[in-house]
Amino acid sequence: MSYENYLAGDPVIITAALTGGVQGKEATPHLPETPEEIGTAAAEAEEAGASVVHVHARKDNGERTFATERFQEIDDEIRRQADDVIIQHSTGGTGASDEDRHLPLRTDPAPEMASLDMGPMNRYDHLTSENTRGLVDSLHEEMVERGIKPELEIFNDGHMNETYGLLDRRDLADPVYGTLIFGPGTLTPPKPRNFINAIDNLPEGAQFNTLGFGRHQLPFVTMGILFGGHVRVGLEDNIYYERGELATSNAQLVERVARIADELGREVATPSQAREILNL
């Protein structure tokens, strides 16, 4: 994917990351946490232009959970309230057991997509997301068994190397779909040069998604549009609409990037178009 894909006006897939597993309503009252709230947020995001919703689960007290039953409740609400949006479960999580990381894959029906973190990360002072090759392989194996498309989350250059390692070890259905992630800490430093290097280093034929954390969300998704890629926005990654002003909803962030894509001449993909692009 490249600037030529932008010039060709290829459709852009917008993913809405609705909730996340870190901050809660103490950070913003607009963050959806209950299954009903997440279902409503998914429907609103789809109406605004999202074809994929990235889903984390929370307990009633707002804490993160990997329980299959909770993901099932959320999926049921999304399917009840939304139209045709693609559900993508998160399997990422600092401090979670390997077994817990598999639980989001076991809903009935399975999600059409799920995230797959490509390597270790330092996230907090005393906790690390290990994401060993053994865990990555076992998650990928279960995704294949259940017909789930993996979304490879590439947080840094080392994870790009791990992506090639996964391709050497296992068969991945075309197209490979990777999310390039920019921000603080272990993430790729949010510099335009690093973005260009990342897309140049992608496996041949791969489709890429662009994610910038916090204030980097808007400039990086705009670059993603201009370089023929796909984009992710949402309250998981950024709770502000502009400096000092909280976003009122996930849909508000989706509406803005959909408008930018339209003004730059790229059609916003429908869920059916996204399924065709990603070979779901």
Predicted feature locations:
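N-terminal small/glycine-rich loop or linker at the start of catalytic domains
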Residues: 4-30, 115-122
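Alpha-helix-loop-beta-strand connector modules within alpha/beta enzyme cores
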Residues: 16, 63-89, 138-145, 197-205, ...
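Histidine-centered catalytic micro-motifs
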Residues: 16, 35, 39-40, 50-64, ...
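Active-site mouth loops of central-metabolism enzymes
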Residues: 16-39, 90-99, 125-129, 153, ...
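Glycine-rich, proline-tolerant flexible connector loops at the mouths of alpha/beta enzymes
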Residues: 26, 51-73, 181-182, 238-243
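Active-site beta->alpha loop and helix N-cap motifs at the rims of alpha/beta catalytic domains
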Residues: 35, 65-131
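Conserved, mostly hydrophobic/aromatic
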Residues: 38, 45, 56, 114, ...
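Catalytic alpha/beta core domains of metabolic enzymes, predominantly
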Residues: 113-236, 247, 252
